[in-house]
Amino acid sequence: MTKTDKKSFNQSLAEWKLFIYNRTTGEFLGRTAKSWGLILLFYLVFYGFLAALFSFTMWAMLQTLNDEVPKYRDQIPSPGLMVFPKPVSALDFSFSLSDAESYQGYIDDLKKFLKPYGLEEQKNLTDCTNGTFFEQKGPEYTACQFPLALLEACSGVDDPTFGYQEGKPCILVKMNRIIGLKPQGEPRIECTGKSESTAFLSTYPSNGTIDLKYFPYYGKKLHGNYLQPLVAVQVGFGSDADVREVMVECKIDGSPNLKTQNDRDKFLGRVAFKITMHA
């Protein structure tokens, strides 16, 4: 390295030091303290204004919302259906009659799901009048009792295996909750089976009836102890084949304002599941 190169490097270093802090002008990174102060003040005011504007718009929007009832409910014209226990694969229940472990998971899932429906858990609920809406004005809201006895052979009371041990599996069907829904007519869940082998269905309560006393629903916050009405479907097979299966479709029926036909949603108000039982 030549003497000229060393001088050029020293000059560059001196210029950098001068840029970082100039003792003569008192500048730091090319600006005086006053200049830095004005810039910081500008950004403080600018971003403070943006934060205040965002907070105000959020506050104004929240004033239009109700903590207890959703503002927009017209996008859900009719409830869908769900089934329990939860199948291992999508809506396909498969088990072996000779292997208790293959259906033990279904039994455990049903017991867990029905736990809130026990006598002790329902002792503080209301014994409502059948056939009429249970409308309440608050501020306290209670729920109607749903006796497990309505599910008869699928209640788990007399048969803790819910029919699986005997080859007559039970599936529970329920409607999704919709706040303020008041079904017209006599709503029920109708289930039909389609299979190559002989299979028959038993529905509990009789005819899959859903009593009007379980409506309307007032929302999770107000109606926290609400129990959804259930319909149980028990499948029996008439053949002795090694593999017996049936395709079951359940849909809402008997209520004009609960739809089961929709071009955009082919599963609106209905659900289909398959049961396969191996020997």
Curated annotation (Swiss-Prot):
Its main location: membrane. InterPro entries: Na/K_ATPase_sub_beta, Na/K_ATPase_sub_beta_sf. It is a single-pass type II membrane protein. The chain crosses the membrane at residues 36-56. It is found in: Apical cell membrane; Basolateral cell membrane; Melanosome. Glycans are attached at residues 124, 130, 207. Disulfide bonds join 128-144, 154-170, 191-250. The keyword Transmembrane applies. Residues 186-279 are annotated as: immunoglobulin-like. Coiled coil: none annotated. It comes from the Eukaryota. The keyword Acyltransferase does not apply. Gene3D superfamilies: Na, k-atpase alpha subunit (2.60.40.1660). One of its GO terms (molecular function) is ATPase binding. Keywords: Cell membrane, Disulfide bond, Glycoprotein, Ion transport, Membrane, Potassium, Potassium transport, Signal-anchor, Sodium, Sodium transport, Sodium/potassium transport, Transmembrane, Transmembrane helix, Transport. GO terms for biological process: intracellular potassium ion homeostasis; intracellular sodium ion homeostasis; membrane repolarization; positive regulation of potassium ion import across plasma membrane; positive regulation of sodium ion export across plasma membrane; potassium ion import across plasma membrane; protein localization to plasma membrane; protein stabilization. Residues 1-35 are cytoplasmic. Residues 57-279 are extracellular. One of its GO terms (cellular component) is melanosome. The C-terminal lobe folds into an immunoglobulin-like domain and may mediate cell adhesion properties. Belongs to the X(+)/potassium ATPases subunit beta family. The sodium/potassium-transporting ATPase is composed of a catalytic alpha subunit, an auxiliary non-catalytic beta subunit and an additional regulatory subunit. Interacts with catalytic alpha subunit ATP12A. NCBIfam families: Na_K_ATPase_bet. This is Sodium/potassium-transporting ATPase subunit beta-3. It comes from Bos taurus.
